[in-house]
């Protein structure tokens, strides 16, 4: 008999508002938690003008709250805000709000290519040129100076269809399934406006060792991204799933030579596996 023992999903979107403002929303819906965050940002200065969070459900239904995060007001909404977010309180008791705040930064970064007027950039190709050096430690294509780097605007069709209202959407989901034995299987999916991938891994409940791993990439902006499809399988088999923090997964895939979206989906499953173990479920 197959039994779902844990599942969760992350949803993120970025939308344009009047007067140079944008909203970035991210939520998590899981078996034991429901949380969300919202940023309102000024793209002319790339600053947060308001940030709020909500905790709607926890295992014991404690720490339920909706409130603002004044520490982020007036701060950058770029990746430079990572350090500020990491220093915030653990609002929900399990790190979900902090993770959603970081997800929002990633979503804003992906949506930047549609904020060009506010940022004073002439067009998508000029945007890629601007980021050529600044993203050198960002992900595989930029770090490796891959051929066809300026193909991204063509791939995402921003030259023919420049998004004006809804700029970016993302959905991540995982399900951990047991068939009654010692080995459980996790299926995880990542889909956003520019990428799509699926991974499946199995691990032992007693030894915590990952016994199988496979992934498929269905959509990607660059040929260099697709190489991860062939490289990833051997990276995780034999590893202890409890050790797979984002930092550890990032190191395994080669840091900025790898795909940080793969980091996301593997680390999400590893966190869920640790949570199950710690809760005795």
List where the protein language model places each region.
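Short beta-strand or tight-loop elements
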Residues: 172, 182-184, 195-197
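Active-site- and interface-proximal helix/loop "cap" or "latch" segments in soluble metabolic
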Residues: 4-144, 190-281
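Short, Gly/Pro- and small/polar-rich lid/capping loops
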Residues: 1-27, 152-180
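Generic multipass alpha-helical transmembrane bundles of integral membrane proteins
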Residues: 145-150
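Short, basic/aromatic recognition patches
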Residues: 185-189
């Amino acid at each position: 008999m197959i039994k779902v023992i844990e599942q969760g999903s992350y949803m993120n979107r970025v939308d344009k508002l009047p007067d140079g403002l944008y909203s970035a929303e991210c939520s998590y819906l899981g078996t034991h938690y429901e949380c969300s965050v919202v940023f309102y940002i000024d793209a002319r200065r790339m600053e947060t003008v308001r940030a709020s969070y909500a905790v709607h459900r926890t295992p014991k239904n404690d720490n339920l709250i909706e409130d603002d995060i004044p520490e982020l007001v007036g701060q950058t909404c770029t990746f430079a805000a990572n350090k500020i977010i990491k220093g915030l309180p653990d609002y929900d008791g399990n790190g979900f709000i902090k993770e959603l705040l970081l997800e929002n930064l990633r979503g804003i970064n992906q949506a930047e290519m549609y904020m060009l007027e506010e940022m004073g950039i002439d067009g998508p190709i000029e945007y890629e040129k601007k980021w050529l050096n600044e993203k050198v430690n960002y992900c595989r294509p930029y770090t490796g100076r891959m051929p066809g780097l300026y193909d991204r605007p063509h791939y995402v069709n921003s030259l023919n269809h420049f998004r004006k209202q809804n700029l970016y959407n993302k959905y991540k989901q995982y399900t951990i399934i047991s068939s009654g034995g010692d080995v459980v299987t996790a299926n995880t999916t990542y889909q956003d406006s520019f990428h799509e991938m699926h991974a499946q891994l199995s691990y032992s409940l007693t030894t915590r060792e990952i016994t199988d791993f496979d992934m498929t990439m269905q959509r990607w902006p660059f040929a260099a991204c697709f190489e991860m499809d062939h490289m990833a399988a051997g990276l995780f088999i034999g590893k202890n799933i409890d050790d797979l923090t984002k930092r550890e997964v990032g190191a395994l895939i080669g840091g900025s030579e790898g795909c940080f979206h793969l980091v996301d989906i593997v680390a999400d499953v590893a966190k869920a596996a640790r949570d199950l173990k710690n809760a005795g479920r």
